[in-house]
Amino acid sequence: MLYQQIAKNKRKTVLVMAGFVFLAGLIGAAIGYAFMGSAQTGIIIAVVVGIVYMFVILGQSTDVVMSMNNAQEITEQQAPELWHIVEDMAMVGKVPMPRVFIIDDPSPNAFATGPDPEHAAVAATTGILQRLNREELEGVMAHEVSHIRNYDIRLQTYALALASVISFLANMGMNAMWWGGGRRDDRDNGNAGQVIMLLLSVLAIILGPLAASMAQMALSRNREYLADASAVELTRNPQGLINALRKISMSEPMQNADPSSASMYIANPFKDGSWTHLFDTHPPIEKRIDRLEHM
């Protein structure tokens, strides 16, 4: 059951990322067709903008993310239990020992960041160190090390870059429509097929960012499920993570979390969510616990 869940989550990730790439290409083609006379030109622009965004976002260092969340790097002597748990999980997961940070916040939570295992770091709040026992803390750190092991931060960066490209292209298309752009020859000659294509292009430009946001959140939720399953693979003890998630779900919102980093945490640090869950960064904790109980 455990390995089936891991394989299923990986397949879903491939599908979501493929959908992202298709959507970015579709919006680029729509922009090109509607306002430049060539769908291929729009696709080329989408590719170039996507590469630029990716390099910019990947260039954001671990230290910047930690600073945004008011996290302080620690040594083994400052928090020996946390340090040794992270060290053990990294060893079992066969990844380099990540840097360890602590956030001074009473709400229990944790996150991992870094573009690859060689430049990764984990952060835990003071609240999680105070409220969780060793078994529960092992479950949480196994979850975070799994994000590092699965290259989730890099994957989320790619998704963010693609979502940013889609938003950028959609804004460009909306501005072109606002200022009266478009293929005047198609509008004037009244060709029904060309008019329909133009309308579909405009519809794609308008709905593209919404679809991209939904896909980005779906990817984030899927990677949380995968990290949960991978954590159990490391600890062989789903109950530790189950108990930790229950405690985290009953806690107050964080005070020192950066909103742009919310998707990185093991649970939403602000506790709010959309009623449909389509725009949530994390799956409902009850569903995560249910999956863990059936492993």
Curated annotation (Swiss-Prot):
It is found in: Cell membrane. InterPro entries: HtpX_protease, Pept_M48_protease_HtpX, Peptidase_M48. GO terms for biological process: proteolysis. Keywords: Cell membrane, Hydrolase, Membrane, Metal-binding, Metalloprotease, Protease, Transmembrane, Transmembrane helix, Zinc. The keyword ATP-binding does not apply. Gene3D superfamilies: Metalloproteases ('zincins'), catalytic domain. It is a multi-pass membrane protein. Its EC number is 3.4.24.-. The keyword Metal-binding applies. Disulfide bonds: none annotated. It is an enzyme of class 3 (hydrolase). The chain crosses the membrane at residues 15-35, 39-59, 159-179, 195-215. One of its GO terms (molecular function) is metalloendopeptidase activity. GO terms for cellular component: plasma membrane. The active site is at residue 144. Its main location: membrane. Its cofactor is Zn(2+). Zn(2+) binds at residues 143, 147, 224. Binds 1 zinc ion per subunit. HAMAP family: Pept_M48_protease_HtpX. NCBIfam families: PRK04897.1. Belongs to the peptidase M48B family. This is Protease HtpX homolog. The gene is htpX.
